[in-house]
Amino acid sequence: MSDSVELFTDGACKGNPGPGGWGALLVCKGVEKELWGGEANTTNNRMELTGAIRGLEELKRPCEVTLVTDSQYVMKGITEWMVNWKKRGWKTAAKEPVKNADLWQLLDEQVSRHTVKWQWVRGHIGHPGNERADQLANRGVDEVRGIKRA
């Protein structure tokens, strides 16, 4: 039987584009692991995707994952849009290249390793896991901007 893991992810950006950060909180059998990072010039959507990718990458064997995000972009992309993007060779219905296709492809690769249940939550309303992921994403932004946290 594979491990059951909760993964809370978030992205943040100060300016869009601008300095951004991603955060991921993994919870398995009561043990928590915090992950975060950032990029100097990025977008909020890229950071949202990166949080999910990095969280899934951290899992070394196939798991049953409940991935919780406040990003409609990530949620709809993975559960609704991606199937058609792949059929069209990573093009939109308007025959334009899919934005952030590099990250969508990485996410698709990571998702294929696990059994993932996607759950959307409204951001910034006090959901504990989402709030923690948001704090981690903002830590990533601060580190990119050279702001140290205690």
UniProtKB/Swiss-Prot annotation:
Residues that, per the record, bind Mg(2+) 1: D10, E48, D70
Give the protein's cofactors.
Mg(2+)
The record describes its quaternary structure and partners as: Monomer.
Q: How is the cofactor bound?
A: Binds 1 Mg(2+) ion per subunit. May bind a second metal ion at a regulatory site, or after substrate binding.
Protein's name in the database: Ribonuclease HI
Its gene?
rnhA
Q: Which residues does the record give as Mg(2+) 2 binding sites?
A: D10, D134
Instruction: Write down the EC number.
Output: 3.1.26.4
What is the species of this protein? Pseudomonas syringae pv. tomato (strain ATCC BAA-871 / DC3000)
Query: Which GO molecular function annotation, any one, does this entry have?
Result: nucleic acid binding
